[in-house]
From Swiss-Prot:
Annotated gene: Sag
Cited Pfam families: Arrestin_C (PF02752), Arrestin_N (PF00339)
Gene Ontology CC annotations of this record: membrane; photoreceptor inner segment; photoreceptor outer segment
Record localization: Cell projection, Cilium, Photoreceptor outer segment; Membrane
Alphabetical list of PANTHER family matching this protein: ARRESTIN, S-ARRESTIN
Key words of the record: Cell projection, Membrane, Phosphoprotein
Location of region: Disordered: 381-403
Subunit structure: Monomer. Homodimer. Homotetramer. Interacts with RHO (via the phosphorylated C-terminus).
Molecular function in Gene Ontology: G protein-coupled receptor binding; opsin binding; phosphoprotein binding; spectrin binding
Superkingdom to which the source organism belongs: Eukaryota
Protein name: S-arrestin
PTM annotation (Phosphothreonine): residues: T231
Length: 403
């Protein structure tokens, strides 16, 4: 009988090399989780070629920026960008006392050998998560949204400015700061509303309920609707939709309300009768790709993402620095016959809030990083669950293009 051999799970390491091969950066992941109380730090290593660096210093920076995007151009024709956060650490030559390397860094230091230097970058708790507003297909340039960039570069200029850093000796990577569903859900969402119509003694009553407060991306959302029609009118149609509300709070407090999924029934509710119906909605980016202004979780280059997750704000944090706040609700709209019966109609509606998020990932403490299980991959985004599509990330030993 064959022996049972336990295999350890491979750990993908994302790498990127500068054009002149002087610096190579390695990260263990691309998404960093905001747990509201604290945010995962960015830990990685930089491999330096001493012959090519030739006495220069090597730095790693973390930048959070809000881009106003194609639609918001100032009077001199420049796309506006506002840096919300910037930090920099020198990794070569090492300076000061180094913190204890993480398990990932220890494995990379052992795997890559000499001339490898660890770094650790932290997020303050007031920064927004990665989010962007989807441009129209014909739009060009940067999209409106919040992004995070890690950059490694070699320079001999003290306090080097962005435009003075030699591009051939630098490499930049877009990463994401993301939130996941909290471990405990809130109360089951529900709403009730009544409307009194002219020449009807009794009201039209609508009750809407969801099975839970948080749904995961790609998960069906069953919406139970009960219409109690005590009027003399006919409810001709019931339409249920998921609406996304994106509030751009940083500069103008604009609201973008976009339906991202809808279902309807033509089943009529006659006077003095009751109907209970459950309609199922699945909000997906795949069904909203051509629509401008839909909020998405931050994306990198041409790789896929998903509809933006609901925003959770830490208590006491100023909302105006959060970039774009995203929320969702279910909207139920009834079409009711008017004075002339089938020839005219009126509409009434009510809303039920809920949250759309990613599930909590596996506990990283349960995962071990083994030297022999490191797989190096080009820094390119993977598809996420709600796109309805599935493509494989391309692997490459020396990914040199900027993202």
């Amino acid at each position: 009988m064959a022996a049972c051999v336990k295999t350890n799970k491979s750990h993908v390491i994302f790498k990127k090399v500068s054009r002149d091969k002087s610096v190579t950066i390695y990260l263990g992941k691309r998404d960093y989780i905001d747990h509201v109380s604290q945010v995962e730090p960015v830990d990685g290593v930089v491999l330096v070629d001493p012959e090519l660096v030739k006495g220069k210093k090597v730095y790693v920076t973390l930048t959070c920026a809000f881009r106003y995007g194609q639609e918001d151009i100032d009077v001199i024709g420049l796309t506006f960008r506002r840096d919300l956060y910037f930090s920099r650490v020198q990794v070569y030559p090492p300076v000061g006392a180094m913190s204890a390397p993480t398990q990932l860094q220890l494995s990379l230091l052992k795997k890559l050998g000499d001339n490898t230097y660890p770094f650790l970058l932290t997020f303050p708790d007031y920064l927004p998560c990665s989010v962007m507003l989807q441009p129209a297909p014909q739009d060009v340039g940067k999209s409106c949204g919040v992004d995070f960039e890690v950059k490694a570069f070699a320079t001999d200029i003290t306090d080097a400015e962005e435009d003075k850093i030699p591009k051939k000796s630098s490499v930049r990577l877009l990463i994401r700061k993301v939130q996941h569903a909290p471990p405990e859900m809130g109360p089951q969402p529900c709403a009730e509303a009544s409307w009194q119509f002219f020449m009807s003694d009794k009201p039209l009553h609508l009750s809407v309920s969801l099975s839970k407060e948080i749904y995961f991306h790609g998960e069906p959302i069953p919406v139970t609707v009960t219409v109690t029609n005590n009027t003399e009118k006919v409810v001709k149609k019931i339409k249920v939709s998921v609406e996304q509300i994106a509030n751009v709070v940083l500069y103008s407090s604009d609201y973008y309300v976009k339906p991202v999924a809808s279902e309807e029934t033509q089943e009529k509710v006659q006077p003095n009768s009751t109907l209970t119906k459950t309609l199922v909605l699945v909000p997906l980016l795949a069904n909203n790709r051509e629509r401008r202004g839909i909020a998405l979780d931050g994306k990198i280059k041409h790789e896929d993402t998903n509809l933006a997750s609901s925003t959770i704000i830490k208590e006491g944090i100023d909302r105006t620095v959060m970039g774009i706040l995203v929320s969702y609700h279910i909207k139920v709209k009834l079409t009711v016959s008017g004075f002339l019966g089938e020839l005219t109609s009126s509409e009434v509606a009510t809303e039920v809030p809920f949250r759309l998020m990613h599930p909590q990932p596996e506990d990283p403490a349960k995962e071990s990083v083994q030297d022999e299980n490191l797989v190096f991959e080009e820094f390119a985004r993977q598809n996420l669950k709600d796109t309805g599509e599935n493509t494989e990330g391309k692997k490459d030993e020396d990914a040199g293009q900027d993202e």
